[in-house]
């Protein structure tokens, strides 16, 4: 045990060496990106040793290394929890980051600040590993906020673009809403448990009130872009493609789901939280699959598929299967990173063209990228014996045999069919048919920095599902039994999506352009959610503020107090003055007549 903990700590510490190197020698060197990439490769190879030892020993451990601060009721320590989740996730995160960094050497080669870009990617990974290995809420919160800050810096990397800056601010604002829930949960645990250590919280009261669990759920909804707080995820595609690949595969977006997995022992007996998680995940997976079906931006299609798969993970947590949700996190990371790298390869070769309607015929000009894109999409749909099959098929089986909610099952099956539909649409429009891009486009996929990551991730997308499922520690749950037609239900829905999409694509190839129906607009406009939240509500607030300012400032203050008040004062004075007609003789005469009459009466 001491051996594999020491090796794992050494692996994590080695990741900080490139950052310290920039502090010692801040001068820009051309070899720094290669140095970071090589460090990542060695860290991955080293991390395989403790992971292998853990799989054979199945003994988790906690490392208490440093007491940071003590108060009367709270002891804050730096401690690492090396259990099944962290030991399995660390090599996966390192492998994917290594591949993405090698891809970045090709994709970002012309960027003048490539050294800083690699440094940001490395810090992004380190903060995620801090979150994964945290043994207390304080350390988890540091990693939680770290991935949020780094996502802001990386999404807005091309800060000369207005859309990139807007997308980065949008990501931060939506994550702030989720952070409120995490902070409320931390305050509640501190007040009621006087501790932020996971072991003590579970030992003191495994059945807390729903309030902190609602806070944790809100945090997960914000970070993992569930329905309601989802618009930031497709907007984050404004960042460079390596950022999108790292953000969506093994770092920020899975942090919310991982938070619920880590706190699942507190949630498993709370039916309200479980049902909310289940229903929210079901709505998210269906809505995002619907949105992906009508998008034309290749990166946004992959982004919506990520959000749909995150909804599937939430469904799994909602039916009390945290290990299955974690398995889907691990398998999903490989083919999602590969899909983004293949998309980046196509975009880069087509001179930054992202519209799939302007592609086509790429299978002959980019054979390796095309093959990997097909394998990645097939793994995403859950085709048997690819990586995605081992987790996605199990999730649908677990949902089918769950007594919780038949409505969630039906929505999950529809979303599964839609997943195969938009994956097939992407393959057909991007790779097949006649080329629809300019003929002078120079396509070249011979760079080793592009080919090696794609080959590695393609291989991983085919075999890692089998390897991981064979190394899950045994649980006490009985093996579910089900009829054959229920066992093949997921495959039926996937095949249905393939067939419908193929038929629709062949049928619509030669149709005239018509006005799209309202259902198409609803899906294409993302359910009008961004229009209402980002346009209509701010417009109404601005209009109301303008009217209020007009009434208070212009109409009342400026007019009533200054110009109109002066004129009104002068009008009143002039009216008083002009009421006297200057008929002094008539006035004296009218005074003398009654006086004369009085004198006559007295005589």
UniProtKB/Swiss-Prot annotation:
Keyword Coiled coil among UniProt keywords: no
The entry's keywords: Electron transport, Membrane, Mitochondrion, Mitochondrion inner membrane, NAD, Respiratory chain, Translocase, Transmembrane, Transmembrane helix, Transport, Ubiquinone
Catalytic activity: a ubiquinone + NADH + 5 H(+)(in) = a ubiquinol + NAD(+) + 4 H(+)(out)
Source species, domain of life: Eukaryota
Topology term for the membrane: Multi-pass membrane protein
Main location: mitochondrion
Gene Ontology MF terms in the entry: NADH dehydrogenase (ubiquinone) activity
Subcellular location(s) of the protein: Mitochondrion inner membrane
Any Pfam family matching the protein: Proton_antipo_M
GO BP terms, alphabetized: electron transport coupled proton transport; mitochondrial electron transport, NADH to ubiquinone; mitochondrial respiratory chain complex I assembly
Parts of the chain that traverse the membrane: 4-24, 36-56, 87-107, 122-142, 171-191, 211-233, 241-261, 272-292, 301-320, 325-347, 370-390, 406-422, 488-508, 583-603
GO cellular component: mitochondrial inner membrane
EC numbers, comma separated: 7.1.1.2
Function statement: Core subunit of the mitochondrial membrane respiratory chain NADH dehydrogenase (Complex I) which catalyzes electron transfer from NADH through the respiratory chain, using ubiquinone as an electron acceptor. Essential for the catalytic activity and assembly of complex I.
Oligomer and partners: Core subunit of respiratory chain NADH dehydrogenase (Complex I) which is composed of 45 different subunits.
Protein family: Belongs to the complex I subunit 5 family.
Protein name in the entry: NADH-ubiquinone oxidoreductase chain 5
Upper taxonomic lineage: Eukaryota, Metazoa, Chordata, Craniata, Vertebrata
